[in-house]
Amino acid sequence: MKFKNKIFLVSLCLLLSVYVFGGTINGLPLHIKKLSDNVIRLWVGDYVSSTAVSALNTDRGIVVIDTTQCPTLDVQFRKIIAKKFGGKNFIYLINTHEHSDHTNGNSIYSDCEIFAHEKCAEGMKRTQADQQRVIGWYKEYIPKLEKQLSEAKEGTDNYKKIKEDIIVRKMNLKALESGIKQTFPTKTFKDKMKLDMGNMTIELFYMGGLHSASDIFVFVPEEGLLFTGDVMADVWLTDTPGCLQSFGGRPGIKRDLPLMLKNWKSLINRKEKIKDYIPGHWNGDLTYNGFVARYNYMETLQKEVKKAVKENKELKSLLTDLHLKTRFPKLAGTPGFTRDFVHNNNIISIWTEKTGAKSASNALAEMIEKKGLKKAVNKFRDEYKNGSKSKKCYYLEHEFNSLGYRYLNQKKYPEAIAIFKLNVEMYPKSKNVYDSLGEAYLKDGQKKLALSYYNKVLKMDPNNANAKKMIGIINQKK
């Protein structure tokens, strides 16, 4: 009998270890990492940048940090967490920020108090209002992925990556179509908050503006863990970093930068208490050096922008002075800093906070929406020439280029051509503006005009590979 009991216990342990530390959910590999005796981290997938949900086993009950984009996945996660910690007493849920891949599963914890920053609910409502557009995007994108899968070699990493992506997108689409019940935070804070959980303390810090308006850090000193949400990572574990790809402010998002830096610095000062930095997605890591380097970077930008505003410098010259590769060479090309526009957005965000100036390209887009294309462009051209908006708005070539491509991708060719033509007028020495205008004319079927602008690019830069390529394509179609 004792021998049979031993076999049963061993079998049970093996079964539980498979259930908790492996297996699959909806065809996706399940991963559960033990961060300490009282903390686990769960995610699905070997390739997709899925949200990593963490759970803390406290004296007062189980605390969960973040949910996923698909509530049915959170149902499974909750069962696993309860099994692991030997109880079903879930007491709190904490959202590190507003985005749907961290809040859509909140309804699964509607029996808990839900903690978040005071701006979180507002952001969740914006996401909810955008659901139909997202559904439409999924319906267009999934068939494209399925086509890619049919062309990929079975068994390769690329094949597995695409397959996982399809599973996740279909799960999310099904959840959206079935109607996700938004469950908003019930307890919010502005600066920081502390939760006494008996065997551990949970400290919440405002960190808004580097990923969303409602970013927070979650610090558990007794466990030596700092959960950083989607704000940053300095190591990518896959070639699809997803939400962790950019370390950048979003122009237009209101934030309290001094408060953010103050909270950030206070955590740097407690480095001896932090053993591990935990990003909001499984496929990124964060080190102490990366954590500090990004703080120093943001502090430098704040000081330099403040100085430039005081000296009446133009934003364009400031962007040149603070060029990523020359001013921050150790960060350039590292995770979060692989795209120049992200760095530029950090500068622009601080600039707009200090000056109150708005983006001229955004102002033009609003005018087009209200007045129609012709009236808006004529009014904008007049205001640019007489300088009436020079103090209220800032003008940047790349922002107008982005606006033009926004229209181009929407197949609004007259709007795209009009924007690119304005960019040519404002920045006649830039070869890129002619290249963009040539592309717009080509997509609109105006080959002669497209050819003339690509020839203009080639005249400015005889070795321009793209211009040569496009001229060749146009000539072949004649």
Q: Could you describe each region identified by the protein language model?
A:
Residues R60-G61, T72-A116, E272-I274:
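Active-site metal-binding motif and surrounding structural segment of the metallo-beta-lactamase
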Residues E151-K153, D157-K174, N269-K273, G284-S390:
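Accessory terminal helices/loops
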Residues I32-K83, I216-V231:
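Conserved beta-strand hairpin/beta-sheet module of binuclear metal-dependent hydrolase folds
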Residues G27, K34, G61-V63, Q69-P71, E122-T300:
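Metallo-beta-lactamase
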